[in-house]
Amino acid sequence: MPVTDAATEPAYTVGDYLLDRLAELGVSEIFGVPGDYNLEFLDHIVAHPRLRWVGNANELNAGYAADGYGRLRGMSALVTTFGVGELSAANAVAGSYAEQVPVVHIVGGPSKDAQGTRRALHHSLGDGDFEHFFRVSREITCAQANLMPATARREIDRVLSEVREQKRPGYILLSTDVARFPTEPPEAALPRYTGGTSPRALAMFTEAAAALIGEHRITVLADLLVHRLQAIKELEALLAADVVPHATLMWGKSLLDESSPNFLGIYAGSASAPAVRTAIEEAPVLVTAGVVFTDMVSGFFSQRIDPARTIDVGQYQSSVAGEVFAPLEMGEALQALAAILTRRGVSSPPVASPPAEPLPPPPPREQPLTQKMVWDRVCTALTPGNVVLADQGTSFYGMADHRLPQGVTFIGQPLWGSIGYTLPAALGAAVAHPDRRTVLLIGDGAAQLTVQELGTFAREGLSPVIVVVNNDGYTVERAIHGETAPYNDIVGWKWTEVPNSLGVTDHLAFRVQTYGELDDALTAAARHQDRMVLVEVVLPRLEIPRLLVELVRPTSPDGSPRR
């Protein structure tokens, strides 16, 4: 067995520099799959005092896990090998780009010398061009670097700074020889982006906003960019400056305390509950904070927002009645609005709430399950601190209408909408915050795509609650088109046996068809906080939630086609 002479090994390498920077940014776990071009780099991850390797069943799942981790931690990292590995993860990375999640994708590549020969190396396309996949990365990441020894430190800092600032993925191609190249540790912390607000723009925005607000009550519609840009405290200060009715889009669900008497609900254009739609669309002054209207969260762009009565607060610019003020950062714009409300000294009346209706009694225990029954009961099972991930199907739209307890975080993927995303993302979320119990809500078709990570949950000692909605195929697609078409069918699995086959030994598994069986299963899940609990919920093929019924209608209320 060959013996490595430690004296010939560099004390500190480019790979170490990259890892130290990631640790500095709050990363403590790195997801991925080993491959021969990244193995030596993985040795450095394993040896790093502040980092831990979390291996995944495949690269796509690793990318999804990094996304879930990044949503909670504000930064994450993914390691794959050249070509075959990175392309397998590309779908996940593209989703992180679409949904503005900061993920650093590190790709172990062939040595520079090997690339220089232009030979047909494994994992390449065989044409001697080793930048095909680097060029692909330009379309789905905000910054890219093909590291060279002389400039590696500077390029690492550039990519990581862009990822942190833009809240989107970055790409680093780390060749085997560059990874082991000697260098020096960072001398100082990674420089932060310093101020993007013009004092003149802020003053003009404040003047225009104050004039529009006057003595009016404002209403706030908030969305996920407030979370991504870490402006939640500024938004909460605005809501505390007066009695401010507020709502979110589905994308921003759980951004605000949904138990507040001033919380209106979820706004989804024409698919909204009537009271929510009226409150938002007829507000005397509407403040939209970090709002991005996508087809699936706006009722296919059926929102009716009057620009003349709207103050729109964005990442780098804000507008008042259509007049744009820039450069102006979101946090400072929200602070200015809070100051306007505080200075005017007018207290708005309480938000009118409909009279409280007595809670209906639970359904009979023997009653077959419906979508509403399932999500009503799941919602009552949630406790502060839970992280809920709902896959893009009946799970997402079933939960969107329900108010969550304070302190619950809700994660979905309504823009990218890659089914199966939430199972590995739940793994990433659980690794990011093992002290918060993860609750995964996913359909049977979606779960079949990424179910391998159940074994990783077990290996990591995690205890999620997993609700698999077994409605015998792709129900959302059936509702849109092809109700009985064979392409919306899937092979049925014995879900309660799946955890065992994937190496999960200490778990509970239930198959439920009635309300009583569901109630018993969720009660058991609450008792066993230290064990994985899988609940297979059997529902009819065409049973879909109210909100999804509205969204899949072929036409808008005015008769125009939605698609």
Curated annotation (Swiss-Prot):
GO CC annotation, single: cytosol
Transmembrane segments: none
UniProt xrefs under InterPro entries: DHS-like_NAD/FAD-binding_dom, PDC/IPDC-like, THDP-binding, Thiamin_PyroP_enz_cen_dom, Thiamin_PyroP_enz_TPP-bd_dom, TPP-bd_CS, TPP_enzyme_TPP-bd, TPP_PDC_IPDC
Matching PROSITE patterns: TPP_ENZYMES
Single annotated GO MF: pyruvate decarboxylase activity
Catalytic EC class: lyase
List of residues binding Mg(2+): 444, 471, 473
UniProtKB keywords: Decarboxylase, Lyase, Magnesium, Metal-binding, Thiamine pyrophosphate
Composition skew (Pro residues), residue ranges: 351-366
Cofactor: a metal cation; thiamine diphosphate
Top-level taxon in the UniProt lineage: Bacteria
CDD domains, sorted: TPP_PDC_IPDC, TPP_PYR_PDC_IPDC_like
Role according to the record: Decarboxylates branched-chain and aromatic alpha-keto acids to aldehydes.
Name the UniProt record assigns to this protein: Alpha-keto-acid decarboxylase
Gene name as annotated: kdc
